[in-house]
Regions:
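Residues in intrinsically disordered, low-complexity segments of regulatory proteins
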Residues: 17, 33, 40, 101-104, ...
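Polar/charged alpha-helical tracts
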Residues: 14-15, 62, 66, 222
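Hydrophobic single-pass membrane-insertion segments
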Residues: 30-42, 230
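N-terminal Lys/Arg-rich, disordered targeting/topogenic segments
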Residues: 1-13
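Hydrophobic membrane-insertion alpha-helices, especially the h-region
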Residues: 16-31
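N-terminal, intrinsically disordered, polar/charged segments of Gram-positive cell-envelope systems
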Residues: 37-94
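Domain-level detector of nuclease and nuclease-like folds
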Residues: 88, 95-263
Length: 263
């Protein structure tokens, strides 16, 4: 009996060591993957004059989706240990526009899809007027479809702002609107948007902010949004997350935006 217990204990130790090794490897991978994968989309010292944001490379979406994995029951997952990947150029741009703020939106691509949106958010960028209708904007992958018994607000899709209206005052801008599920919009993006808005309104100062829709291949619907924020003068206020563009109970075809009820 005692020999069996010693053997079992040794097996458990070996198993624990293997698990620890795997976790350390995954942690190192997550820590190093993103800086190597990301382009410096906002090296504005060179680009600001002509207003260019370079879209991410084609394989970037595959790297992101491989790292974050499939939806697992939570609307968000941390990326790069929660640390955003803003460059020194981004921070210099923040310092230049620390009071009045700054916003830059990528041009739509050949499929009509949004690219990254970057901003230096301040009280000056927040809206002072009532929000108007955005119903005339039809972002890529848009369909008007309802699941009344699955979704409290009935409709599967919202026109989701990459940079929220409450933060930017930017409303019916096609370069700032993607097709997102109600779940992405309300459970995923809204809590982070409110967190940033509260920080600024309570005197926290300027915040660097980037929202990157992640499209796989020629998909018209983004698989999710990579969201980063960092206070210009307070590095303790920051986050870096991936938000899943899913809707529990609904199966989505990301190539077209079509959907059906899960069996």
């Amino acid at each position: 009996m005692s020999a069996y217990r010693r053997k079992r204990r040794g097996g458990n130790i070996r198993k624990a060591l293997w698990i620890l090794l795997i976790l350390l490897t995954l942690g190192a991978l997550q820590q190093t993957l993103w800086p190597n994968a990301r382009l410096s989309w906002t090296a504005q010292a060179e680009k600001e004059a002509i207003g260019i944001i370079v879209p991410p490379p084609g394989d970037y979406a595959e790297e992101v989706l491989t790292a974050v994995g499939s939806y697992y029951g939570s609307p968000d997952i941390s990326m790069n240990m929660g640390q955003p990947l803003f460059t020194e150029e981004d921070r210099q741009l923040g310092e230049q526009h620390e009071t009045e703020g700054y916003e830059s939106y990528a041009d739509l691509d050949a499929l009509g899809r949004c690219g990254p949106a970057f901003a230096v958010l301040t009280k000056a960028t927040m809206p002072t007027e009532k929000r108007e209708s955005i119903g005339d904007v039809r972002p890529s992958g848009w369909h008007t479809v309802r699941y009344d018994d699955l979704i409290e607000d009935k409709y599967l899709y919202n026109r989701c702002h990459l940079i929220a209206y409450m933060l930017s005052g930017e409303n019916a801008n096609p370069q700032n609107l993607i097709t997102g599920t109600r779940y992405l919009n309300i459970s995923g993006m809204l809590p982070y948007e409110k967190r940033v808005a509260d920080y600024i309104e309570n005197g926290g100062g300027a915040v660097l902010y980037r929202a990157t829709p992640v499209f796989l291949g020629d998909d018209l619907l983004a698989r999710g949004v990579e969201l980063e924020a960092e206070a210009l003068r307070d590095p303790e206020f920051s986050f870096h997350v991936f938000l899943y563009n899913v809707q529990p109970g609904v199966r989505i075809d990301y190539a077209s935006g079509q959907s059906k009820r899960e069996a």
